[in-house]
Amino acid sequence: MKDFYLYDDVPVLRNLLNIKDEKLLEEAESNITYVKLLDIDDKICGDAFDYQRIKDIHTYIFGDLYEWAGKERGINIVKGERVLGGDTVRYADTNSIEPEMEAALKELNQVKWEVLDISETAELFSKLIAKIWQIHPFREGNTRTIITFATQFSEKHGFRMNKALLKDNSEYVRDALVKASDGMYSEYEYLIPVSYTHLRAH
């Protein structure tokens, strides 16, 4: 299927800046999203940790770059992952994005986080965030969006993820999410150190 998110003449995401050089787009995206992430907790707040919040986060971070920010992707995607030997994570089919997301978020919100100790919290939180991330609701920007959602959720529920996590360890975070999403026998230990190291009890 043709990827209609790309320009016709170059394999670069269509963007509001009309940048057709992949490296220049990556640089612009990095600069813009860095600034957006500085004040996102002031812009996206409240007690509802639902699918709309995830869409709002994506819209705020990427709205100056992509007209489809905050909208579900319209194509199925594959991404070769180094830590999987070039294989792809099995992301949600476009027809199942919303129901899978609603189910995953329901599971996340039903946990009684206050009764878990820090190691139990780290393990369960890692599994559930990995499940949400694996759905990959957007064409691009899923990791930054879901990790932002995760940091806000953890703050609200009495445990903390270091907000420098994404900025300072973005490659490791993505690799950990990839490994945690790798098939039926998911290797959550690759993701647990991320949460456990950066989780701090109040």
PLM ranges: what are they?
Residues D50, I54, T121, F125, ...:
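Hydrophobic (often cysteine-bearing) scaffold residues that line and stabilize catalytic clefts
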Residues A180-D182:
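A structural-propensity feature for long, helix-poor, extended segments
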Residues T197-H202:
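Conserved small/polar residues in nucleotide/adenosyl-binding loops
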Residues I57-F62, F125-I132, V173, L177:
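Short alpha-helical scaffolding segments that buttress acidic/His motifs in well-ordered protein cores
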Residues M1-E72, F153-E155, F159-N162:
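N-terminal structured helix/loop subdomain that forms the ligand-binding/catalytic interface
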Residues Y91-H136:
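Helix-hairpin-helix/helix-loop-helix acidic hairpins
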Residues I135-S170, Y185:
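Short conserved catalytic/interaction loops centered on acidic-Pro-aromatic/His motifs
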Residues K55-L105:
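A glycine-rich, hydrophobic loop/mini-helix early in the fold
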